Structures are given as structure tokens and as C-alpha cells.
């Protein structure tokens, strides 16, 4: 199962890094990177990350009464990938935003209360802040998403 998390981590980091380079700046949000690539890339990455995370995260939270948070978060990540065109389609916008809020909230709660690696999130938020001091206010959504996903991937490893 650890193989799945390694694959998800490598795919996410590669996608993230190349997206920042391609954009020549920090994106406003992770979802905004959808518009930088052919239409299949962002959905493929989010689906791969969501489905790869699911069995490993469920195993990592086994026995916890909050295990359902990992399921909700993974499913929400997959739905974000299935509804990427949030700027041009009102229905996709609604689904995308609801799933983004659910994924963020449930991942954050799981990271803090179940996995116990809340300090990893703080470290990555600080690193993101230091890498973008002047533009952090404009890109705060991206930095929060990025820090949360990387913290989560590392804490499950």
C-alpha cells in the first residue's frame, strides 16, 4: 500500500512543480492550474491522487471514530478532478467549490485530530510564506492547499 502513497506524492509534486514553472508564478489556487494544461491533465492528477490516497489513508486512520474524514476528503478530491472547469460552468463551479471546502476541512481535521501531524502543516505554510512573501495574500489559497496536501501525503507515508 505504501507504493500507492509514493506514486501519489511523486505525481502531485511533479504536477505542482511544473505548473508553477509553466505559470511563471504561484497560481491563485491549485484548481487554477487546470487552465494551464490540456483538459485531461488536472482531472487525471486529482483522480490519481484521490484514489491512491484512499486505501492508505483509511489504513492509517483505522480504529479511529473519525476515519470517515479520510473517505470524505479522498472522494472530494476525486470530485474536484471530475469537475475542473469551475470558471466556465456554473454547475461545475458549485460542485467544485463544495468539494474543495469539504476536502480541505476534512483533511485538516484528520491531519490535526487523527494523524497528529498538525505541525507539518505549519512548517509547510511557513515555507510557502517565505517563498512568496510579497504575493502571499494573492496566492494564499494555493499555498494553503499545497501545504495541506504535502503535509497529508508525508504524514500518511
Per-region residue spans from a language model:
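Helix-coil boundary and interhelical linker segments in multi-pass alpha-helical membrane proteins
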Residues: 1, 55-67, 109-120, 157
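N-terminal topogenic module of multi-pass integral membrane proteins
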Residues: 1-60
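Residues within membrane-spanning alpha-helices of integral membrane proteins
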Residues: 6-9, 46, 50, 67-74, ...
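Small-residue-rich segments of transmembrane alpha-helices in multi-pass membrane proteins
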Residues: 40, 97-112, 144-157
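Hydrophobic, membrane-inserted alpha-helices
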Residues: 49-54, 102-110, 124-129
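Juxtamembrane "helix-exit" motif on the non-cytosolic side of transmembrane helices
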Residues: 57-61, 82-89, 113-114, 130-136
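Membrane-proximal helix-loop-helix units in multi-pass membrane proteins
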Residues: 67-122
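Terminal transmembrane helical module of multi-pass membrane proteins
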Residues: 115-157
Amino acid at each position: 500500500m505504501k507504493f500507492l502513497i509514493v506514486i501519489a506524492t511523486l505525481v502531485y509534486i511533479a504536477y505542482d512543480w511544473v505548473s508553477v514553472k509553466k505559470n511563471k508564478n504561484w497560481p491563485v489556487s491549485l484548481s487554477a492550474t487546470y487552465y494551464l494544461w490540456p483538459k485531461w491533465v488536472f482531472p487525471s492528477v486529482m483522480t490519481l491522487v484521490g484514489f491512491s490516497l484512499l486505501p492508505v489513508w483509511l489504513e492509517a486512520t483505522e480504529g479511529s471514530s473519525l476515519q470517515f474524514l479520510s473517505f470524505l476528503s479522498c472522494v472530494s478530491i476525486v470530485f474536484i478532478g471530475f469537475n475542473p472547469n469551475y470558471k466556465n460552468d456554473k454547475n461545475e463551479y458549485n460542485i467544485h467549490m463544495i468539494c474543495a471546502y469539504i476536502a480541505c476541512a476534512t483533511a485538516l481535521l484528520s491531519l490535526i485530530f487523527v494523524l497528529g501531524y498538525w505541525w507539518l502543516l505549519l512548517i509547510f505554510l511557513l515555507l510557502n510564506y517565505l517563498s512568496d512573501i510579497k504575493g502571499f495574500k494573492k496566492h494564499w489559497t494555493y499555498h494553503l492547499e499545497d501545504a495541506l496536501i504535502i503535509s497529508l501525503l508525508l504524514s500518511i507515508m
